[in-house]
Amino acid sequence: MMRSTFAIAAAVAGLGVAGCGGDDKALTKAEFVKQGNAICAKGNAELETEEEELIADGKAPDREELIAFFEDEVLPNVQGQIDDLAELTPPEADQGEVDELIASAQEAIDKSEGDMEAVVASDENPFDDADEKAGAYGLAECAI
């Protein structure tokens, strides 16, 4: 169970999402991927630090500690990644693909916030679809 829980944390931390973007000029796909990966890498590093603190005593966290970790650290971090990536303007030709990615990621966040106990207890990762979409788009730092 610990392995699956930390696997979900890693997947969530690396979640790659992108959004509709602001009113800025559209980026090229290469620019979008570069900036998106930088956003995810920063978020991942922050979560790695938090996870190291969680397991610093060498003892596996109990269920309540895991739930608190997800609620207090993982989900806000990933939501921040989603929000930051949504500020990027993807290439016009990729808008639909990017919209699907962000919708999938937000759905996973909402599901997780709605029943964190079930997410922690499950071997399934609610972010699998978003991770797959991120990886397919080239956001390697965002799809773990």
Describe the residue ranges of each PLM region.
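Bacterial signal peptide processing site
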Residues: 21-23
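Bacterial N-terminal signal peptides that target proteins for export
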Residues: 1-7
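C-terminal motif of bacterial Sec signal peptides marking the signal peptidase cleavage site
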Residues: 16-19
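Alpha-helical segments in soluble extracytoplasmic regions
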Residues: 29-117, 123-144
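Hydrophobic helical h-region of N-terminal Sec-dependent signal peptides
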Residues: 8-13
